[in-house]
Amino acid sequence: MTRYALAIAFASSVLTSYAVRPAAPDRPTVKRIFREARVTRGNTNILKVQPIDDASWLWLPGDSGMMQLGERKLGSHSNNGGLMNPIFLKFRNEFEVKEGDGKLVIDVSADERYFLTCDGTFVSRGPNRSTVENWQYNTYEIDGLKPGRHILEATVWRIGDKSPLAQLSWRGGFILKANEAYDERLTTGVAKWKVGKLSGIEPAGADDGAWGTGSQWKITGSGIVVAEPSAWTDAEVVRAVAGQRGPHIYGARTKGWMLFPSQIPDQTENSVTPGRVVAATHEAGWRANHVYTEAETKAPEVKAFNDFLAGKTTRFTVPARTKLQLAWDLGRYICAYPEVDLGAAKGARFSWNWTEASHRGTDYLKGGEPGARDAIIGRYLGGFGDTFIPDAAKGGTFTTPWFRCGKWCRLDIETGDEPLHILDISLTESRYPLEMESAFASKDDASLADIRRISARAMQMCCHEMLFDCPFYEQQMYPGDTRVQLNVISAMSRDDRMIKRAIELYDLGTRDDGQCPFNWPTRGAQEGATYTLCYLLMYGDYAMNHADRAWLRARLPGLRKSMSGMELYENADGLLENLPGWSFMDWVVGWDWDGTAPGGRFGEGVNAEANLLWVLAMKSAALTERALGHELQARYWDEKREKLAAKIVETFWCAERGLFASTPKKRDFSEHAQCLALLGDVLPADKAEVCFRHLISDDDLKRCTVYFSYYLFETYFKFGRGDLFLKRLDLWRDYVKKGLTTTQESPDWTDEKGGQHESRSDCHAWGAHPIWFMQTGLAGIRSAAPFFVKVRVAPCPGNLTELRAKHPHPQGFIEVDLKFDSGKASGMVKTPVPGTFVFGGQSIPLVVGENAIR
């Protein structure tokens, strides 16, 4: 365990909203506190509305903390870097604690990010990503401070255009507010804080990293967290206290950060050393891709390093004048801060690269054969990462400003005239504390457990301070992904805080015409109306599956703005036409490379898939309005939806084929259009049956891939065909066979010329939705009324003869234990709310508690 990890371990093994972090003897304990949620701007920065408004923001004198003239401005998506030099600062306050002072309570934030300790004990890192108008701060209670001298210390950095694309910023700053007993000693702007600049930290190429995840780093000296400035000076106030007390008749807002208390728990801080080193070589160049041989899997350094990882030895030594490359299989996908403790060694350097998979040395592909993700012989490890150069006299403890991710690590080590002692190495796993609280099992299909395992891991790896499409690329929220992810979270856990946060962030980012950002938060904005439609579906999902009416009511202006904005793009017939931006639908083999359905681009006219999503958005809006008591608004969307449905049938329905075409020319047909039409109830029942029959039998339809299979599976279960769902899971079964520990972005495929194409990403949580369907489809547990006050259990088990499931509910869990035989069900349903059980002609009322099914 590194010196840096040791500080964290003293503080916590897993950070949660309810547990005090255990401390070592004579060290303080830290407890997260949640300030009352505020969902509107209100008087923020006009009046003092919270304790932190009495604190000032600090920075280093002489540094503007802002983008300089001639630099690439925030908002550019180019990858050519900028002129801004990242700055890393350390703020310090030495203070005295007296008898009777009691617990210390602090509110803390920074721009861009901070790492905070008290007497060397880890307190927190943050803040959670957001917009300047919704800047986040956290609150902590620090207990056990004995009389005497203590130190609060924060490492704060502003990377600017070399930070991940999702990192927004106003200017550099640090703010901390202490409770009354400690106010004069600790509150920034009241107490004296020292600040110093840390040296030896510089970006090292590819400043957007792996497609938007930030710079790689070259760090020389002692490391970001433990390094000391060469000189200290008094920190200066760069923005004074926000707002004023009492009435403010002019309503003027203080510029800059508008602070809101974070409502999501801290990220996990688990120190781990997973997996094992599987190959070692002295033949690779510095940070060079090297194809490993079988002999290199048996090199003596393999066993020696694995003994070191297992704690059997206290150090791993690389001799003087040596080049060594190690291939480390982490065993499963992980998001973590790398941590390594290096001894003093003049001329030594240590590189730590991360990648999702090994690549074959012959064709550079990851491969789809069984066990491909675990293979190393004949393969190389690429990826991206960081270089650490220890102080020649003192060594150093190294980590990175932001987490790294993947299933594989490649360590490149080079020494000069002195040996390098690696004193410790570990990972601090970082993610939202989302755990699998639900359950599903059937002895009839063992593969379902494996599919749940990789789906859950994918969801965990894409859930952090905000949701990600994927952790290796972009690290941004995309509404199409997010809508699916939110329902996966609903199926995994009763915790709805990330669900609310995601919808909130999109609401904060909508444009003046109601369009939701295609990717958000971001400095490199994209537009796409089809994803605005996906954003609108999240409201109805929340209204049905969760219970916070007050929160949903506060978000209603966002729903209404975007719904009204979509109406601006209707033509004279009421159809959406010439939508702005990228009308992405799915990565479909046979469509153009950009994933847009035929007729979906600007200037191409009208398209069925986009208009059918608009139908679903109207259903979602009507449901949400009605759930909140706005019947007039709900009827407006119901009536408008009926008119749109009729026009869609008139324009796109091909009676000869019993299918919806993608365009009025009726030459292109997709599973996507049929699914959306059937889910939107645009056809009468008899024609819907015809459409469904052709959906499952016509082999020339363009097929849904990983993401859009969500809508396909919803359609299967709407028509009671759990057997089709189980069959279509073969793609996920192949993931397991390949050795994947998460779900991919898209299927691998071969083009008409025999060229092989692979999924870009090995971890995309839009493919985690089988978890949702096992519980809501196979087990059939669904909300039957807004805010989940009623349940409908209507299992569609396919060929399963028995199943057991546990599904989250705002008041607990709904559990089923069922057997199926000759079209009859038997077993048990336990529920915290009343409802109905439906199967094979049976319709049984469910009461609160345990219900026998016979």
Predicted stretch roles:
Residues 210-211, 216-221, 639, 726-854:
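Non-catalytic C-terminal accessory modules of carbohydrate-active enzymes
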